[in-house]
Amino acid sequence: MPFGNTHNKYKLNFKAEEEYPDLSKHNNHMAKALTLEIYKKLRDKETPSGFTLDDVIQTGVDNPGHPFIMTVGCVAGDEESYVVFKDLFDPIIQDRHGGYKPTDKHKTDLNHENLKGGDDLDPNYVLSSRVRTGRSIKGYTLPPHCSRGERRAVEKLSVEALNSLTGEFKGKYYPLKSMTEQEQQQLIDDHFLFDKPVSPLLLASGMARDWPDARGIWHNDNKSFLVWVNEEDHLRVISMEKGGNMKEVFRRFCVGLQKIEEIFKKAGHPFMWNEHLGYVLTCPSNLGTGLRGGVHVKLAHLSKHPKFEEILTRLRLQKRGTGGVDTAAVGSVFDVSNADRLGSSEVEQVQLVVDGVKLMVEMEKKLEKGQSIDDMIPAQK
């Protein structure tokens, strides 16, 4: 596995020019931002836990680009990475998050009552609704860098916290290594569990080391509230259900997440957060809220409309295939979610999804009847 920063000192025997990666064929945010000057300036630096510039960029060097989406091409190994390597991370964050400046402040709003509507998305079109976020536990390094012992400590802490939840959140933890192949595959097929670590982005960044040690899934009894432990982030918190009631999904998400955060705080392990980056996560694309509010929505006609991409962009939404980031749409069903993470709040981001999906379903219905939607094309939000 292409990973290991053990010989950083040895690399300094070579000139920066000799070590600088060839990024001429690359299409990711890191490749755009990493000049030779920045490489020279940062290559001998490391965070207190020993994460280096080459560790930050390796995944983007090994994965030049993705056909559908502009990938970020770098990861953080710990909370300090964003400070020590800010000369690289700042331009990447600015580029990825619509001009978000190093002086900007992020805002958080997890009061679900501030969401307007969302309980009336047409279930004939909106097949399922889901909101997820990531959280990192202060005092531990992140998945690209953590040791086995550290990863197991994160798992132990998380399971103790999650097992103390009650009521609608009462549930159970299922460690990956005690699952059979069949059980695992079933959970993946049902969209409950993260995939096996075949993604080159996971592999090249070192996040899949020691797999499946100390990874698992915790979920409540009716599988509407789930927590992944030690995949790309320490925790991924997910609220989901069939149909179009995003209001209820978001309520459960906010309430459950705040309960978990409270338990971790009491145990002396708050989540990583600062007022500039919001919640600190492994991938710079998730900074801020870490939130992706998405629906599986059937858009047989709209998806063939020449303005489909433009409509999504104007609504500040993005689409993925039915099975997630690397997949195609099956039966005109798309995974549509908020494009923004940083600089706007959780409520604002889910509001964009609710309002935007509602509009797109109305457009779809008009197109079914053979009517024009030109007068419905939204302005840029």
From Swiss-Prot:
Please report the organism this UniProt entry assigns to the protein: Sus scrofa (Pig)
Instruction: Print the keywords alphabetically.
Output: ATP-binding, Kinase, Nucleotide-binding, Phosphoprotein, Transferase
- What does the record list as GO biological process? phosphocreatine biosynthetic process; response to heat
**Residue numbers of Phosphoserine PTMs:** 164, 178, 199, 372
One GO term of the cellular component aspect?
A: extracellular space
Write down the InterPro entries for this protein, in alphabetical order.
ATP-guanido_PTrfase, ATP-guanido_PTrfase_AS, ATP-guanido_PTrfase_cat, ATP-guanido_PTrfase_N, ATP-guanido_PTrfase_N_sf, Gln_synth/guanido_kin_cat_dom
The family database entries (Gene3D superfamilies) matched by this protein are listed as:
ATP:guanido phosphotransferase, N-terminal domain, Glutamine synthetase/guanido kinase, catalytic domain
- Residues forming the Phosphagen kinase C-terminal domain are 125-367
The identity of this protein, by name, is: Creatine kinase M-type
Q: Which family does it belong to?
A: Belongs to the ATP:guanido phosphotransferase family.
Catalytic activity as recorded in UniProt? creatine + ATP = N-phosphocreatine + ADP + H(+)
Give residue numbers for the modification (Phosphothreonine).
166, 180, 313, 322
Tell me its EC number(s), please.
Answer: 2.7.3.2
- For the Phosphagen kinase N-terminal domain, which residue ranges apply? 11-98
Q: What does this protein do?
A: Reversibly catalyzes the transfer of phosphate between ATP and various phosphogens (e.g. creatine phosphate). Creatine kinase isoenzymes play a central role in energy transduction in tissues with large, fluctuating energy demands, such as skeletal muscle, heart, brain and spermatozoa.
Q: How does it assemble?
A: Dimer of identical or non-identical chains, which can be either B (brain type) or M (muscle type). With MM being the major form in skeletal muscle and myocardium, MB existing in myocardium, and BB existing in many tissues, especially brain.
User: Where do the annotations place ATP binding?
Assistant: 128-132, 191, 236, 292, 320-325, 335
Broadest EC class assigned to this enzyme: transferase
